[in-house]
């Protein structure tokens, strides 16, 4: 007899908590379905009622890891904030969510980041989703005359490089939260709109007074 979907969902949530416990104890060591079944006190065949295979398990882990950040991206892009505030909150709120994870359990976060590197194909879609929502903000800014002469992809690429320390969770470990303050991020976002503002163009950017090294 098939389990009701509510039971399946509850079982998956409980199993993801077991995954957390395994990662806390073992770090980023690869977790097999057999390991998870043993830790959960169930047979492997019963485990497959909740996750069809290891890929499905990894996808569920990634979905939970990124869930709050996706909610933030949706809320910010759908808000009525001025476009500069929208871009700031888009980065700042996700950064603060990462800081909360880091301060709560830094070792657990580090282990999950290492797992994400091992299975990047699983998390790639979430990385691309971040660019998608940023593109919506950039497009809105372009409608107001910002980033003139740049394509959406060009603007997104430049912006991502400028705020990289606030979007890369690894930076929390080698830069730290004391230096990575949201007040600095606000200044960076303001500078983005000033430097790539309404009078900016691809031609102007190509005529920089800085001598390019080769």
Predicted regions located by residue number:
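Helix-turn-helix
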Residues: 14, 18-56, 60, 64
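C-terminal peripheral helix-coil segments that are non-catalytic and often amphipathic
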Residues: 2, 89, 132, 136-143, ...
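Hydrophobic alpha-helical connector segments
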Residues: 60, 64, 74-100, 156-159, ...
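Short amphipathic alpha-helix in the helical subdomain of ABC transporter nucleotide-binding domains
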Residues: 8-11, 152-159, 181, 185
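Amphipathic alpha-helical packing segments from all-alpha helical-bundle domains
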Residues: 67-70, 97, 117-143, 153-157, ...
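Short, charged helix-capping/linker segments at alpha-helix termini
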Residues: 6, 24-32, 146-151
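Amphipathic alpha-helical segments used for helix-helix packing
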Residues: 98-118, 168-172
């Amino acid at each position: 007899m098939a389990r009701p979907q509510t039971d399946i969902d509850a079982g998956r949530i409980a199993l993801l908590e077991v995954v957390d416990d395994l990662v806390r104890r073992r770090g980023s060591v690869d977790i097999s379905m057999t390991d998870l079944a043993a830790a959960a006190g169930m047979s492997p065949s019963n485990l497959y009622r909740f996750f069809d295979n290891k890929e499905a398990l990894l996808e569920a882990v990634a979905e939970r890891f990124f869930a709050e950040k996706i909610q933030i991206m949706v809320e910010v892009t759908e808000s009525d904030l001025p476009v500069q505030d929208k871009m700031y909150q888009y980065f700042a709120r996700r950064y603060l969510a990462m800081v909360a994870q880091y301060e709560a359990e830094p070792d657990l976060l580090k282990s999950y980041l290492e797992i994400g590197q091992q299975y990047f194909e699983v998390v790639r879609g979430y990385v691309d989703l971040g660019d998608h929502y940023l593109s919506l903000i950039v497009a809105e800014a372009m409608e107001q005359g910002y980033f003139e002469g740049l394509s959406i992809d060009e603007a997104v690429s430049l912006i991502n490089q400028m705020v990289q320390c606030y979007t890369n969770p690894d930076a929390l470990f080698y830069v730290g939260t004391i230096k990575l303050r949201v007040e600095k991020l606000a200044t960076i976002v303001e500078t983005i709109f000033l430097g790539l503002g309404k009078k900016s163009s691809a031609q102007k950017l190509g005529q920089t007074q800085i001598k390019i090294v080769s």
